[in-house]
Design a protein with these regions (language model features):
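Non-catalytic accessory segments flanking enzyme active sites
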Residues: 26-69, 73-74
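Short, contiguous pre-domain boundary segments
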Residues: 9-25, 181
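Generic structural signal for secondary-structure transition and capping sites
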Residues: 43-47, 95, 209
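Rieske [2Fe-2S] iron-sulfur-binding domain
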Residues: 55-159, 163-173
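Generic structural "secondary-structure junction" signal
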Residues: 21, 26, 31, 44-45, ...
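C-terminal catalytic domain of Rieske-type non-heme iron oxygenases
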Residues: 57, 82, 88, 147, ...
């Protein structure tokens, strides 16, 4: 209920004021047109995380990103162990092929029954005689650029993207000591709120609220204010947590 009231307040604000000589219109956080622009200029041009690598660790497994979006992507591990990424759209009529993570020998469109091997090749066309000169061997799912880093499969929807390592602007070196590829999920929770991605991201970058909301956890073990750095198209925030106090607290509450 409290979260719903906060979201409703954002909707009603004509402007979100800040210190200095600038202000930000509240609609930037809720307007569908603004979101469409950001999707086109940011998310469909840059590298984004498609799925954790463990979801497609076994041959025959697949994972899906944005299953309800027209720009949905499916990541597969074929029977030979090779990783692939494709637009989640049947080459026949564009219907979504995958609705959820799974495992099997083929991807099958639930609309007309066209099926594909996990390497993207068209495998079966029901009543193929009605399609004249269609050559199944010449048709396949549209491939999407992908790369693996930090235990994640990254994808890029643009036609000729720069290498992931170039895009990360050195952040990959900063993250390497954390061995993210060795981490395993312990809990998954899904929240649905009527705001777009910026509200979630800005909350993560907003250390200003930590003293009030997280006073007995993170804030109690932070040595100093976070360090912010602009790296190309990215913003990096380093938060220095007192290691021994933090580790002791985790041991007491999580062991």
């Amino acid at each position: 209920e409290e979260r719903a009231e906060s979201v409703d307040t954002i909707h009603k604000l004509p402007r979100v004021e800040r210190f200095g000589d600038r202000s930000i219109e509240g609609r930037r956080y809720t307007d569908p047109g603004q979101l469409d622009l950001e999707l086109a200029l940011v998310f469909r041009r840059g590298w984004v995380v498609g799925c954790p690598l463990w979801q497609v660790s076994e041959p025959g497994s697949w994972s899906v990103l944005n299953e309800t979006s027209p720009f949905s992507v499916v990541v597969t591990r074929d029977t030979n162990g090779t990783l692939h990424a494709f637009r989640n759209a049947c080459v026949h009529r564009g219907s979504s092929i995958v609705k959820a993570c799974g495992k099997g020998t083929a991807l099958r469109c639930a609309y007309h029954g066209w099926s594909y091997s996990l390497d993207g090749r068209l495998r079966e066309v029901p009543r193929a005689e009605g399609f004249g000169g269609v050559d199944p061997h010449a048709m396949r799912l549209k491939a999407v650029s992908h790369a693996v880093f930090a235990g994640m499969v990254w994808i890029n929807l643009s036609e000729d993207p720069e290498p992931l390592a170039t895009s990360l602007m050195g952040i990959d070196e900063d993250l390497e000591p954390y061995a993210l590829s060795e981490m395993e999920p312990i809990q998954e929770r899904v929240f649905s709120v009527p705001v777009n991605w910026k509200s979630m991201m800005e909350n993560a970058f907003d250390y200003y609220h930590a003293a009030e909301v997280h006073r007995h956890t993170i804030h109690a073990h932070v040595d100093s204010a976070p360090e912010l750095a602009i790296l190309g198209d990215h913003m990096c925030q380093n938060l220095h947590i007192a290691p021994y106090k933090w580790r002791r607290m985790l041991d007491e509450h999580c062991s």
